[in-house]
Amino acid sequence: MEVVILAAGQGKRMRSALPKVLQPIAGRPMLEHVIAAAQALEARRICVVHGHGGEAVRARLQHAAVQWALQQPQLGTGHAVLQALPHLTDGDMALVLYGDVPLIGVPTLRRLEAAAGGERLALLTVELADPSGYGRILRDGAGRVVRIVEEKDASADERRVREVNTGILVAPVARLRDWLARLGNDNAQREYYLTDIIGMAVAEGVEVTTVQPDAIWETLGVNSKAQLAELERLHQRNIATRLMEDGVTLFDPSRIDVRGELLCGRDVEIDVNCVFEGRVEIADDVRIGANCVIRNARIGAGTRLAPFSHVEDTTTGRDCVIGPYARTRPGTTLGDGVHLGNFVEVKNSAIADDSKANHLAYIGDADIGRRVNVGAGTITCNYDGANKYRTTIGDDVFIGSDTQLVAPVRVGRGATLGAGTTLTKDAPEDQLTVSRARQISIPGWKRPVKKKAGE
């Protein structure tokens, strides 16, 4: 089977410079969701028909394994599919999808493909309590589909029909080529409707069959930011349901955002308002506090993330404790049992087992050994305005509060750095290193006093 995805619309109601099909659902362009569904069907070929903002669309999805066809100007859905025909092969079946219908399910599409067989025309239809705005499915007395009428061209009786066309269909490529060549635009919109091929199929004796989706929301399109937000919530709720079915405890399923791929082990708990972006892997028995943001990370078993922690491009070992208000940036690797407390930031650093930085520290471009204590207010001075340098700290080091380590510098195994030290040279193993001004007290010193007005 071959797939045609119509993605040429402007989306004026979006009121956005971003092409409609690039508007995001769960952190990915809507069109990317549709392409993923087509790929899951193992389609022989995927052709995307683009138009408005075509350069931006192609640039954003340049790595997708698709072919591109330009529709310019946009003269309706039939005209759009016509642009894809040079990429299609007679003898195959063609599935028509839409770049602004991002939640279409693969099981539904498989049933539609099966219904079409190798020679029938299969339509995906739904029955709506309020069918306003949709093309109506018209059937004869025996229940056979005879044609589709768009609402603007429908009579009063036809508008009362509740079964509507979703636009998604499967048809033989050879017949599709013939039907599209004969399309006219004698309608209220002066456009070439893809739906007109149904009447042609019926006239030629081609069987037209219909399939209902597993859920109506699969067929919902997006034409406004309000509809975009509605589908976002639907999608997130579906993700939350799948997570809970897999054993994840969500404190409130309506307050989680997954904008990528989230893989969870057993007995994972996730509090409210957490955001997961990219690929996130969470091992067994992990607890994630409220309002955390986790992006492209692997969280080790038994780890605890306290509220308001941000974890990005990070790998943690087992039984780590992070936060509250901690941040790990790209390139961070934590061993087992590492503690990062409130207002600790780590970037491009490796911290080995059982080391701790419990509060108010910046660790950048550093390699820290086992069982190291990083005191409050400690920073690695890794940037000289032009280049960045690394700090290396051995096992069993104790770093006093308010210490600055000016890289490149090494702290030997078992060393102690006194509070307030500014370390500019390597600190030897198993020694106390202190670098600060000598403390003095001045007897009789008087604090300056402000002069009063008139004095």
Swiss-Prot record:
UniProt: acetyl-CoA binding residues: 376, 382-383, 401, 419, 436
An example Gene Ontology biological process: cell morphogenesis
Annotated residues for binding of Mg(2+): 100, 223
Cofactor(s) needed by this chain: Mg(2+)
Job of this protein: Catalyzes the last two sequential reactions in the de novo biosynthetic pathway for UDP-N-acetylglucosamine (UDP-GlcNAc). The C-terminal domain catalyzes the transfer of acetyl group from acetyl coenzyme A to glucosamine-1-phosphate (GlcN-1-P) to produce N-acetylglucosamine-1-phosphate (GlcNAc-1-P), which is converted into UDP-GlcNAc by the transfer of uridine 5-monophosphate (from uridine 5-triphosphate), a reaction catalyzed by the N-terminal domain.
Quaternary data: Homotrimer.
Name of this chain's protein: Bifunctional protein GlmU
Gene name of the record: glmU
